[in-house]
Swiss-Prot record:
Signal peptide (residue range): none
GO molecular function (one): metal ion binding
Parts of the chain that traverse the membrane: 5-25, 43-63, 76-96, 108-128
Lineage of origin: Bacteria, Pseudomonadati, Pseudomonadota, Gammaproteobacteria, Cellvibrionales
Function, as annotated: Fluoride-specific ion channel. Important for reducing fluoride concentration in the cell, thus reducing its toxicity.
Record entry for activity regulation: Na(+) is not transported, but it plays an essential structural role and its presence is essential for fluoride channel function.
Residues reported in the UniProt entry to bind Na(+): 83, 86
Protein's recorded name: Fluoride-specific ion channel FluC
Family statement: Belongs to the fluoride channel Fluc/FEX (TC 1.A.43) family.
Stored NCBIfam families: crcB (TIGR00494)
Domain of life according to the entry: Bacteria
Membrane topology term: Multi-pass membrane protein
A Pfam family the protein falls into: CRCB
Main location: membrane
Length: 133
C-alpha cells in the first residue's frame, strides 16, 4: 500500500533541505576562512553559533512574531539554514578536546563564551528587530 505525501509536506521537506544545504556550505566557508589562523580557541564555531543565534532572533521576529514572510521561510531559514549553519555537536567535541589536551581554561572560557554570547545575541536581535520592524 502506497501513501501519497501531500504536496505541502513535500514542499516543506524541500525547503528544509535547500536551507540546510546552503547553511552547511556557509558553515564550511567560515571554517575555511578561519583555518589559516591556526588558533587554539575555536573561533569559527563560536562565530557561527553567535551569528546564527543573532539571525535566529531576527527571523523569529520577522517570520514568527510579525509574519512578514510566508511560513515556508521558517523552514528554509530557521530550521534548514540556521540549523545547519550553527553547530552544537562541533562545539561539544571541540570543548572536550580542549579539556582532554590540558587546555581546561580555554575549554571553560569557550563553553561560557558560546552559551553567554549566543543567548545574548538572540536577546539583542529580538529586541532590536522588534524596534526596527
Amino acid at each position: 500500500m502506497t501513501s501519497a505525501v501531500p504536496a505541502t509536506s513535500l514542499i516543506l521537506w524541500l525547503a528544509v533541505a535547500l536551507g540546510g544545504a546552503l547553511g552547511a556550505l556557509a558553515r564550511y566557508s567560515v571554517s575555511i576562512a578561519w583555518m589559516p589562523a591556526q588558533l587554539k580557541f575555536p573561533v569559527a564555531t563560536l562565530t557561527v553559533n553567535v551569528l546564527g543565534s543573532f539571525l535566529m532572533g531576527v527571523f523569529y521576529v520577522v517570520i514568527v512574531e510579525k509574519a512578514m514572510l510566508a511560513p515556508v521561510w521558517r523552514h528554509v531559514i530557521m530550521i534548514g539554514f540556521l540549523g545547519a549553519f550553527t553547530t552544537f555537536s562541533t562545539f561539544s567535541i571541540e570543548s572536550l578536546h580542549l579539556w582532554q589536551s590540558g587546555h581546561w581554561q580555554i575549554a571553560i572560557s569557550y563553553v561560557v563564551a558560546n552559551v553567554v554570547l549566543s543567548i545574548s545575541a538572540v536577546v539583542v536581535a529580538i529586541v532590536l528587530t522588534e524596534k526596527l520592524v
